[in-house]
């Protein structure tokens, strides 16, 4: 049985990622786009778009473009979005690296992705220098002052138009740990990421000027898409946190009148139980959205009761750009990951027999839609094991669908 979304079908625009993300930048020129939570340092939409185009111009002048890969290994800071979209505007591909990786793990990703430039911060420079040995990386740049080249050295004459590439070209290469061995490069195209941004507006619409408090790392697909790209495309204000600190999170949520918090289950636990929460005014909070790992119904209820707002879940994976299920406002159900987002299909399949299962029966979740990756980089076997000939992505996760489509 094929399950379809309860929400109306949508049309996916035939556009590239960064033009889509910058669609409101001109109109919102003087509005804050990115704010460093720790210092208050701000990039307006005009400054953000200008920096993206200057970086793309600098990359193009170096002969860096389609088919080339720039790696980013940095915490969440405003310049992360500049490096990401400057690379995309130049027609190239970004691979995002977990800064907590060992030098060996970083080296694997640099080699496997074919990265030739690396953007990092001074704190991670020693690991970066060790990791680039024996890879194709020719130069390291840092966002903050260090003994490496500054990221500003990548800036050049602004490139006013996006370099022409196909929406089916790969723009992002996050790495997914998968279940075995070293992580695998997940090829995500412009079309994949734009599709998921449009699909999720039905459930994650952002008001212009609304603050998105962003401590979920941008190297991870949840932070990259649901926070950074989603908020910027809709005219939101992305307030970055380099790492999670409960007190700073609560202070920023209070100061910036945060309406929706995007978190993972350990943060829900803190919001439900930590005494610090009582010291801050979180009365503007309308919902807490938890992803990245399963959230128990009891904990969600406890946090919701304390905060006086909905605590809901979504579901996705890197290979799905990332969202396939989410909970629209007013549709909360305890323990549910929500309903299918628009233009997405799913099946619940018996992993032993491959037969479709009925309502209420647990089986493997399969997903099909425009957000499904074309495959893993340099790994046809893993791709064939994950996506079948009919385009169904076999998630490896177990769940069931109830009578209400949850």
PLM features: what roles do these ranges have?
Residues 30, 157-175, 182, 205-211:
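Conserved pre-ATP/AMP-binding loop-to-beta segment of ANL
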Residues 33-77, 81-85, 102-107:
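Conserved AMP-binding/adenylate-forming core of the ANL superfamily
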Residues 42-46, 171-198, 327:
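Conserved AMP-binding A3 loop
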Residues 62, 73, 355-360, 364-406:
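Conserved ATP-binding/catalytic segment of the ANL
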Residues 68-69, 75-95, 99-103, 108-117, ...:
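A short helix-loop-beta submotif of the ANL/AMP-binding
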Residues 123-167, 274:
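ANL superfamily adenylate-forming
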Residues 194-211, 218-260, 273-274:
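Conserved AMP-binding/adenylation subdomain of ANL enzymes
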Residues 255-263, 272-333, 345:
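Gly/Ser/Thr-rich phosphate-binding loop
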């Amino acid at each position: 049985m094929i399950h379809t979304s309860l929400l109306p079908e949508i049309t996916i625009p035939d556009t590239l990622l960064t033009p889509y993300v910058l669609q409101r930048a001109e109109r919102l020129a003087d509005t804050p786009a990115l704010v460093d939570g720790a210092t208050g340092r701000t990039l307006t939409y005009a400054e953000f778009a200008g920096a993206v185009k200057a970086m793309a111009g600098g990359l193009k002048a170096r002969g860096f473009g389609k088919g080339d890969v720039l790696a980013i290994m940095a915490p969440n800071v405003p310049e992360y979005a500049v490096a990401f979209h400057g690379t995309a505007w130049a027609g190239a591909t970004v691979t995002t690296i977990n800064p907590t990786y060992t030098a060996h793990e970083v080296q694997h990703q640099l080699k496997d992705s074919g990265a030739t430039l690396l953007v990092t911060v001074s704190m991670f420079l020693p690991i970066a220098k060790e990791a680039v040995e024996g890879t194709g990386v020719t130069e390291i740049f840092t966002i903050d002052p260090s003994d490496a080249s500054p990221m500003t050295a990548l800036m050049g004459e602004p490139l006013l138009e996006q370099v022409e590439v196909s929406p089916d070209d790969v723009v992002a290469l996050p790495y997914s740990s998968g279940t075995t061995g070293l992580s695998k490069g997940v090829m995500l195209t412009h079309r994949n990421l734009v599709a998921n941004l449009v699909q999720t507006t039905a459930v994650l619409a952002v008001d212009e000027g609304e603050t998105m408090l962003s401590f979920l790392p941008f190297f991870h697909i949840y932070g990259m898409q649901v926070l950074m790209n989603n908020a910027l495309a809709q005219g939101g204000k992305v307030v970055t946190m380099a790492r999670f600190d409960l007190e700073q999170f609560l202070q920023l949520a209070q100061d910036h009148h945060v309406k929706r918090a995007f978190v993972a289950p350990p943060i829900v636990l803190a919001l439900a139980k930590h005494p610090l929460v009582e010291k801050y005014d979180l009365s503007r909070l309308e919902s807490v959205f938890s992803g990245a790992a399963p959230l128990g119904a009891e904990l969600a209820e406890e946090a919701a009761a304390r905060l006086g707002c909905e605590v809901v879940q979504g579901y996705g994976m890197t290979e799905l750009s990332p969202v396939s299920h989410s909970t629209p406002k007013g549709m909360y159900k305890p323990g549910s990951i929500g309903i299918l987002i628009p233009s997405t299909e799913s099946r619940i399949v018996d992993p032993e027999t491959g037969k479709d299962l009925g309502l209420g029966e647990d089986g493997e979740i399969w997903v099909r839609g425009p957000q499904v990756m074309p495959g893993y980089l340099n790994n046809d076997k893993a791709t064939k094991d994950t996506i079948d000939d009919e385009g169904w992505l076999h998630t490896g996760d177990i769940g069931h669908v109830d009578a209400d489509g949850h």
